[in-house]
Amino acid sequence: MLTPTDAPACDAIVASLPYFFGDPAGVRDCAAAVRWQRGYVATADGDVAAFLTVERHNPESAEITWMAAHASQRRHGLGRRLIEHAAAELAREGVRMLCVLTLGPSVPEEAGDNYSGTRAFYASCGFVPLRELELRSWNDAYALMLVRAIGAPRTR
């Protein structure tokens, strides 16, 4: 579980990824999220190496609001483990749908195709694209909403 004492390590993770976290407002929003939202951390050699924050929008759905692994720890399975842990815990609480937003395919790549890799990562974790949204809070960029069923279907 992410605790307030993990926040500086999460800030350092964000600082290690300037090609993903280049917008100062986004960096500030992420810093606030790791201090106030529910979240999870993964460690490597005893240090926080990755984090994920979630927000519950209603009793049956949640959103991954921020997720990152330190540049030196990317592609080691930490992100996948964080998603699976969060999904299992949320499902036990009755959440049935998990969503995440990332830059959509309509956004021109400026950083070496980083976000196509992000979209592929989420697809490999069972997320499917739902729709692209133009978000004013993202400087009018197009965000792709991806969703994944995680809990048991509701019975009537």
Segments from the language model and where they lie:
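A short beta-loop-alpha structural element at the N-terminal edge
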Residues: M1-C10
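Conserved acetyl-CoA pyrophosphate-binding loop and the N-cap/start of the following alpha-helix
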Residues: Q73, G77-H85
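A conserved beta-turn-beta hairpin within the catalytic core of GNAT-like acetyltransferases
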Residues: R56-M67, R74, E93-M97, W138
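Short glycine/proline-centered loop/turn elements that form peptide/ligand docking sites
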Residues: Y115-T118, E132-Y142
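Conserved GNAT acetyl-CoA-binding A-motif
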Residues: L90-N114
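Conserved active-site tyrosine of GNAT-family acetyltransferases
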Residues: Y122, F127
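Conserved beta-strand in the GNAT
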Residues: V41, D47-E55, E63-A68
